[in-house]
Swiss-Prot record:
UniProt superkingdom: Bacteria
Pathway: Glycan biosynthesis; glycogen biosynthesis
Record-listed E.C. numbers: 2.4.1.21
UniProt: ADP-alpha-D-glucose binding residues: 27
Pfam family, one: Glyco_transf_5
UniProt KW DNA-binding keyword: no
Name of this protein: Glycogen synthase
Organism: Photobacterium profundum (strain SS9)
Gene Ontology MF, one: alpha-1,4-glucan glucosyltransferase (UDP-glucose donor) activity
Keywords from the UniProt entry: Glycogen biosynthesis, Glycosyltransferase, Transferase
Length: 508
C-alpha cells in the first residue's frame, strides 16, 4: 500500500470532482458529505475545482440553476446521440455542473423506488462518466486531476485510457478513484453499456457474476492512476477477501497505488458551541460540559418519551441494516436493559430489524425508545443528549457518527473496523488518552461486554469518565487536513499524478 509523501505545489491544479450525489443538492449517504466538503477545502487552498453530478428531478436549488450548455453526447459506431444540458448550480465558490438528461434523471428518487433499484442504473451512470468528460471538452475545462467516487463514476478512468488515449485535450489528465464502500460494485449486463461500447471488448467481469455482466468499480480500480479509500484501515481491509467483498485481487494488483485518507468532519454543522438544534450549547470545560449534557439529556428524554432520570443514556442513529450491526445489538439489548440505563435508537430500514426493535420498545418503554424515522434535528439532539454512542458495525469504511460523538463529548463504542479503528482510542488499551471503547469480535457477546465496561466506567469512575469526555472533545478531524493529504496523493510518491503538469507550469 502506498505511503504518504508530503509534496507541495505553488501552482494551482484544475480538479474535476465527479459524484453521484452532493450534500445540499442530493444526498442518500456520506458520499454526499465528502462531495461537498473536500472540493470546498481544495478550493480554499487555491485550486480550481469543479463538481459534476446528475440533475435529478428532486435536486435542491433547481429553481436557481442556469443552463450553460445544451449539447449532445455522440458515441462513435452508435446510431444515436443523447441530448443533455449542463446546469450550473449555486454552491459558494465551487461551481457545480449538473447533467440534465431527463431520460436518466427525471425520477422521484436517486437510485431506487420502493427498495427496488432502477433497472437501467448501469446506463444512467455510464452516461454520467461519459458526459463528464464530454462537457470538459465543450466547456474548455482541461483538468489536471479527475477525482472519481465509487462505482457510479468508475468508467471515467477507463475512458481516459481507451477512448481518450490519443486526445490532446486530456493528454495530461490523471484520474483518482475514491472507494467509499466496496460492497457496491456497479455490476450490470452488457446491454447497459451501449454508450461505452469499448468496455465490452475489455470484459472487466466480476468473476462471481454471470459472464454477461461487467463491474464498473472493477474497471475504475483497474484503470485509475491512483486508488484511495476513505480511511487508512479501510485501505488495508480492501486487500483482504472479507474487507473487499471479493475484490481483493483487484486491490492487491493496485497496492502500490492504494492510499487511505480519513474523511473530515463538518464542524460548521456538528459543533456543540453553535448547534441550533440542541437545548443548551456547551463547551469542553467541565462546568459547561456537565450542564450542557444534562440539559440536552433532559430534552432528548422528553422528545422520545423516556423518564427524565439521571441514568447513563446510550444512543444510535443509523440505517437499520446488518452493516450497522443491529443483528449484534438486538440479541443482547434486553439483557443490557436490566441495568439502570436508557437506550435511544433512531433510524429506518430493514423491516425485520425494525419489528424486533419495536417489540423491545413496547416491553421496555421506560428504558428504550425506538424512533422509526430520520430527522436531522433529532440526530443532533441524540449526539448531544446521550453519554455513549453505539456503532457495532459489520464494516464501516470511514464513519461519521463517531466523529460527531467525539465533538459532543459522547463516547463512541465501536467495532475495530474501517475508519472506526482510525478515529477512536480504546479505554481498555490506553486509558490516559482514550476517547471511547473498541472491541474486535463480531458477536453479540463481545458487544455486551463493552457495553458493561462502559457502564462500569460511568458509574464507578465518574471523574475518569469526564476526563474521557474532554479527551473526545479535543479530537479534531478537519477537512483542511484531509484535503492536504489528498493533494499529497495527487502530487506525491514516486509516480506523481501531476508532476509533469507542475513542471510544465514552472517552465512556463
Amino acid at each position: 500500500m502506498a505511503t504518504k509523501k508530503t509534496s507541495l505545489t505553488k501552482h494551482p491544479l484544475k480538479i474535476l470532482f465527479v459524484s453521484s450525489e452532493v450534500e445540499g443538492f442530493a444526498k442518500t449517504g456520506g458520499l454526499a458529505d465528502v462531495a461537498k466538503s473536500l472540493p470546498a477545502a481544495l478550493k480554499k487552498m487555491g485550486h480550481d475545482v469543479r463538481i459534476v453530478m446528475p440533475f435529478y428531478q428532486t435536486i435542491n436549488g433547481k429553481d436557481n440553476a442556469v443552463a450553460i450548455l445544451s449539447t449532445e453526447l455522440l458515441v462513435e459506431s452508435q446510431p444515436f446521440a443523447v441530448s443533455y444540458q449542463v446546469m450550473q448550480l449555486d454552491e459558494g465558490n465551487v461551481p457545480v455542473y449538473a447533467l440534465d438528461a431527463p431520460q436518466y434523471y427525471d425520477r422521484p428518487e436517486l437510485y431506487a423506488e420502493n427498495n427496488q433499484a432502477y433497472a437501467d442504473n448501469g446506463e444512467r451512470f455510464t452516461f454520467l462518466s461519459a458526459a463528464s468528460l464530454d462537457l470538459c471538452e465543450k466547456l474548455g475545462f482541461q483538468p489536471d486531476v479527475i477525482h472519481c467516487n465509487d462505482w457510479h463514476t468508475g468508467l471515467i478512468p477507463f475512458l481516459l485510457k481507451t477512448r481518450y488515449a490519443e486526445s490532446d485535450f486530456f493528454a495530461k489528465s490523471k484520474s483518482v478513484i475514491t472507494i467509499h464502500n466496496a460492497v457496491f460494485k456497479g455490476v450490470f449486463n452488457y446491454d447497459q453499456y451501449s454508450l461505452i461500447p469499448e468496455l465490452i471488448q475489455r470484459r472487466y467481469i466480476n468473476a462471481e457474476m454471470d459472464p454477461s455482466h461487467i463491474s464498473m468499480l472493477k474497471a475504475g480500480v483497474a484503470y485509475a492512476d491512483k486508488v484511495n479509500a476513505v480511511s487508512p484501515n479501510y485501505a488495508s481491509e480492501l486487500l483482504t477477501h472479507l474487507g473487499s467483498h471479493g475484490m481483493e485481487a483487484d486491490f492487491q494488483n493496485r497496492a502500490k497505488d492504494l492510499y487511505g485518507i480519513i474523511n473530515g468532519c463538518d464542524y460548521d454543522d456538528w459543533n456543540p458551541e453553535t448547534d441550533v438544534y440542541i437545548k443548551q450549547k456547551f463547551k469542553a470545560n467541565k462546568v459547561s460540559l456537565a450542564r450542557g449534557k444534562k440539559a440536552c439529556r433532559r430534552d432528548l428524554q422528553k422528545q422520545v418519551n423516556l423518564p427524565e432520570v439521571d441514568v447513563p443514556v446510550y444512543g444510535m442513529v443509523c440505517r437499520l441494516t446488518e452493516q450497522k450491526g443491529l443483528h449484534y445489538l438486538i440479541p443482547v439489548l434486553e439483557d443490557f436493559l436490566l441495568n439502570d440505563v436508557q437506550v435511544v435508537i433512531v433510524g429506518t430500514g430493514d423491516p425485520t430489524l425494525a419489528s424486533a426493535l419495536r417489540d423491545i420498545s413496547e416491553q421496555h418503554s421506560d428504558k428504550f425508545a425506538f424512533v422509526e424515522t430520520y430527522s436531522n434535528p433529532l440526530a443532533h439532539c441524540v449526539e448531544a443528549g446521550v453519554d455513549f454512542f453505539m456503532m457495532p458495525s459489520e464494516f464501516e469504511p470511514c464513519g461519521l457518527n463517531q466523529m460527531y460523538s467525539l465533538a459532543y463529548g459522547t463516547l463512541p463504542i465501536v467495532r475495530s473496523v474501517g475508519g472506526l479503528k482510525d478515529t477512536v482510542i480504546d479505554y481498555d488499551q490506553t486509558p490516559q488518552v482514550a476517547t471511547g471503547f473498541i472491541y474486535d469480535t463480531p458477536t453479540p457477546e463481545a458487544l455486551l461486554i463493552k457495553l458493561q465496561r462502559s457502564l462500569l466506567l460511568y458509574c464507578q469512575r465518574p471523574q475518569e469518565f469526564k476526563r474521557l469526555q474532554q479527551n473526545a472533545m479535543a479530537c479534531k478531524f478537519n477537512w483542511d487536513e484531509s484535503a492536504e493529504q489528498y493533494l499529497d496523493m495527487y502530487l506525491g510518491g514516486e509516480q506523481s499524478l501531476v508532476n509533469e503538469i507542475c513542471n510544465d507550469k514552472v517552465d512556463a
